[in-house]
Design a protein with these regions (language model features):
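Expand to "…catalyze enediolate/carbanion chemistry for C-C bond making/breaking, isomerization
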Residues: 2-221
């Protein structure tokens, strides 16, 4: 568990009045909305996903290991530098959180839920914040951020008509980058280069494993 837990909640913590009694009603409602969305959508298969398995294969394992935390924040009146500093704080908290090594550490994720941010403003706020944080956080600490909000136009890897990044409340997740992230970087050469430098030989193996699954290889085996 992270050393600082007052503002971090496992999904099951939301049912504990003792843990949530000091939360503003807006914050508690937003956390419940995201938690329900995770339980009913993110960890389930979807017919439009284009592959088997849950919408996000990472999340069921994180829930099982109790390494996924929700954190409510109100930022409507804050400017971009303030939000950048806020997320920097969560990044430091994430890096210090137990576990810090082993398999469990690979499944840590903090979901920062912006409880008073409208969907209309979310894209602009996230774009501005990530312009400051995304590259240095990845290069220095291997951290990736994932923005979700209603109206997000990002599409699924295996189905360009399916938009899985649309959440009921805007949030930004913080997690370790993994070798499988290359699929999200294929259309961005700069990010693909950063990924290759970070993972080195493991990156080559990840691509080779994917190539082995292609039809031309299957036909030879």
């Amino acid at each position: 568990m992270p050393a600082q837990t007052t503002n971090l909640f496992l999904l099951e913590d939301l049912e504990d009045v003792g843990r949530t009694s000091e939360l503003a009603e807006r914050d508690l409602h937003a956390l419940h909305a995201v938690a329900n969305w995770i339980r009913t959508y993110v960890v389930k298969p979807h017919q439009d996903l284009g592959r088997a398995g849950p919408v996000c294969p990472f999340v069921p394992e994180a829930l099982e290991r109790k390494t996924l935390w929700l954190a409510p924040e109100q930022i409507a009146d804050r400017d971009v530098p303030d939000v950048v500093e806020l997320i920097n704080g969560y990044q430091r908290l994430f890096l210090d959180a137990q576990p810090t090594d082993g398999d469990d550490a690979s499944y840590k994720v903090i979901v920062v839920v912006f409880t008073d941010l409208s969907a209309e403003r979310a894209q602009g706020v996230f774009d501005d914040v990530l312009q400051h944080l995304a590259v240095p956080s990845y290069v220095e600490d291997g951290i990736v951020f994932g923005p979700f909000y209603e109206g997000h136009e990002g599409t699924a890897i295996y189905n360009s008509s399916f938009r899985p990044f649309q959440s009921p409340v805007p949030f930004l997740f913080v997690r370790h980058g993994v070798t499988g992230d290359w699929k999200f970087f294929l259309d961005d050469e700069d990010w693909l280069n950063l990924w290759a430098r970070r993972f080195g030989e493991s990156a080559v193996h990840a691509l080779a494993e994917e190539l082995r699954r292609l039809p031309w290889r299957v036909g030879r085996d």
